[in-house]
């Protein structure tokens, strides 16, 4: 770890390296959420439109976006492993940034489905390499007893939210209003800024941090890894080819189905691996058992929350009034702008929850209660979305304020689930599987989006009310079940609350 001077106050009293990581993550999130804000629209926009897209069916477009999200979170396992065993965190982050940049450049080219699949592959792999490791780098800027650590992470999260907040406004406006490929170009430019900020700042402020892998392979293990990787790549290419040959017309749907299965099976393998490991003590196994209902609940939560870039995006474009008149003034709304409501309400509501938990102290609700209430709020947010269809039918346009209200309630639910889930994942983790348990939390999101790839195609005008109602009720029921069974879960959790 770098020897840091605690008296150095150049970035809100924090180490100067934090500014580098803040800027890197700001631009990476700008790139990620900017692209995601317009991706589904690009996929189903007609090829003959003035702002042409790929002309895919809406159901297929939503499934592709869901699978993309699932693989992004699944790839974080690979990124963490590469940093720990092969390259070190620093080089892994930079390589990931290069791959993301190349992916956005590929999306900016007018080569149709070919460039789409190449681009998504590069962005998925690059994000998996950058995302988990840059958070780890923030921690390495501080010694374990440095009181500035928590504040540093809070500042880092502000960078994430700021990038997420402005991305839909800039990339969305240009992408939908002018040209999709130009919008993707802006996302690529954002990643170039991220790469430059990281390269320049790393050399100046923390050249030694993350330079080497923490658990490097010996030469024999490295050779075996390269052989295994070569075999996996060859098998994947052959499988890809056979899947296409089996049914060219249904290739995309078959590909989505295969990836959905992978997204669901991987967490099961992880749980089995931890439960059967001889390194896990009996007390740790009980805590791991307590984590299962929380993990399953998180899948339900993320399945609803992650539909903001698919189902909610489609609803915003096809069902909301994009030219509302407020206070006598007519506004125009680009549908992609709705994606900024998520980070906006996170920014607005976070201080309220922080102050509430600080005030309650030891009297604040347990993890199980927070999870249950969060899921119930998330379910209620979807029940809110049934009202436009119930009140006025599903053929016309509804007020944009329905989406504002939905996001406000849903983000309140997220603040009860997401930070608590991160925290409890570390607390319930067996000593031998600390990093893997953090990966499990990301896998809950991955699994939820793998499931979404199968259920989002069910959403259409004729099923709108039923879809929102059933999905919302499921969220509420799961939340209620958690509250009912909280005592046996808390008993399994032991001293963790």
Swiss-Prot record:
The question of whether Transport is a record keyword is answered with yes
List UniProt keywords, sorted A-Z: Cell membrane, Membrane, Peptide transport, Protein transport, Transmembrane, Transmembrane helix, Transport
What Pfam families has UniProt attached to this entry? Answer: PTR2
An example of a Gene Ontology cellular component annotation for this protein is: plasma membrane
Keyword set includes Signal:
no
Major place of localization?
membrane
Cell compartment(s), UniProt:
Cell membrane
Topological domains annotated Cytoplasmic:
1-36, 84-92, 135-154, 201-224, 274-293, 355-372, 445-497
Classify the source by domain of life.
Bacteria
Q: Which residues form a coiled coil?
A: none
- State which residue ranges cross the membrane: 37-55, 65-83, 93-111, 116-134, 155-173, 182-200, 225-243, 255-273, 294-312, 336-354, 373-391, 426-444
This entry's Gene Ontology molecular function terms read:
peptide transmembrane transporter activity
Task: Tell me which Gene3D superfamilies the record gives.
Answer: MFS general substrate transporter like domains (1.20.1250.20)
- Give the bilayer topology: Multi-pass membrane protein
Chain ranges sitting on the Extracellular side read 56-64, 112-115, 174-181, 244-254, 313-335, 392-425
The free-text function statement in the UniProt record for this protein reads: Proton-dependent uptake of di- or tri-peptides.
| PANTHER family to which the protein is assigned, alphabetical | PROTON-DEPENDENT OLIGOPEPTIDE FAMILY TRANSPORT PROTEIN, RESISTANCE PROTEIN MDTM, PUTATIVE-RELATED-RELATED
Family statement: Belongs to the major facilitator superfamily. Proton-dependent oligopeptide transporter (POT/PTR) (TC 2.A.17) family.
The entry's protein name is: Di-/tripeptide transporter
């Amino acid at each position: 770890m770098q020897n840091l001077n605690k008296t150095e106050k150049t970035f809100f009293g924090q180490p100067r390296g934090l500014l580098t990581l803040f800027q890197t993550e700001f631009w990476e999130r700008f790139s990620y959420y900017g692209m995601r804000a317009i991706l589904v629209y690009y996929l189903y926009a007609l090829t003959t439109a003035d702002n042409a897209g790929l002309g895919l069916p809406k159901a297929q477009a939503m499934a592709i976006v869901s699978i993309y999200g699932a693989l992004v979170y699944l790839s974080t396992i690979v990124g963490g492993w590469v940093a720990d065993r092969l390259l070190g965190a620093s080089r892994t982050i930079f390589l990931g940034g290069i791959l993301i940049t190349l992916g956005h450049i590929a999306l900016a080219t007018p080569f149709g489905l070919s460039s789409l699949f190449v681009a998504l592959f590069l962005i998925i792999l690059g994000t998996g390499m950058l995302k988990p490791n840059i958070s780890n780098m923030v921690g390495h800027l501080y010694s374990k007893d440095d009181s500035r650590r928590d504040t540093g992470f809070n500042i880092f999260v502000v960078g994430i939210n700021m990038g997420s907040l402005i991305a839909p406004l800039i990339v969305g406006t240009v992408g939908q209003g002018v040209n999709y490929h130009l919008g993707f170009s802006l996302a690529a430019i954002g990643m170039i800024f991220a790469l430059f900020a990281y390269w320049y700042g790393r050399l100046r402020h923390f050249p030694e941090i993350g330079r080497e892998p923490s658990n490097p392979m010996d030469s024999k293990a490295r050779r075996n890894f390269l052989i295994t990787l070569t075999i996996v790549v060859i098998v994947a290419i052959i499988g890809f080819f056979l899947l296409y040959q089996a049914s060219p017309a249904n290739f995309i749907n078959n590909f989505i189905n295969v990836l959905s299965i992978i997204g669901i099976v991987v967490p099961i393998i992880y749980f089995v691996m931890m439960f059967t490991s001889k390194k896990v003590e009996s007390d740790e196994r009980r805590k791991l058992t307590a984590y299962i209902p929380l993990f399953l609940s998180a899948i339900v939560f993320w399945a609803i929350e992650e539909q903001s870039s698919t189902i909610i995006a489609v609803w915003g474009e096809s069902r909301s009034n994009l030219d509302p008149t407020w206070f006598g003034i007519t506004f125009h709304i680009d549908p992609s702008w709705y994606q900024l409501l998520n980070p906006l309400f996170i920014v607005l509501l976070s201080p309220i929850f922080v102050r509430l938990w600080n005030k309650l102290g030891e009297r604040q609700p347990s993890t199980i209660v927070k999870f249950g209430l969060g899921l119930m709020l998330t379910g209620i947010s979807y029940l809110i979305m049934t009202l436009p269809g119930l009140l006025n039918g599903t053929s016309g346009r509804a007020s944009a304020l329905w989406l504002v209200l939905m996001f406000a309630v849903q983000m309140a639910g997220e603040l009860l689930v997401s930070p608590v889930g991160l925290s409890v994942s570390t607390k319930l983790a067996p000593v031998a599987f600390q990093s893997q348990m953090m990966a499990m939390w990301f896998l809950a999101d991955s699994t939820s989006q793998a499931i979404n790839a199968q259920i989002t195609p069910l959403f259409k005008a004729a099923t709108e009310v039923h879809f929102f109602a059933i999905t919302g009720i499921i969220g509420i029921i799961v939340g209620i079940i958690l509250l009912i069974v909280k005592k046996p879960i808390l008993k399994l959790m032991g001293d963790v609350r």
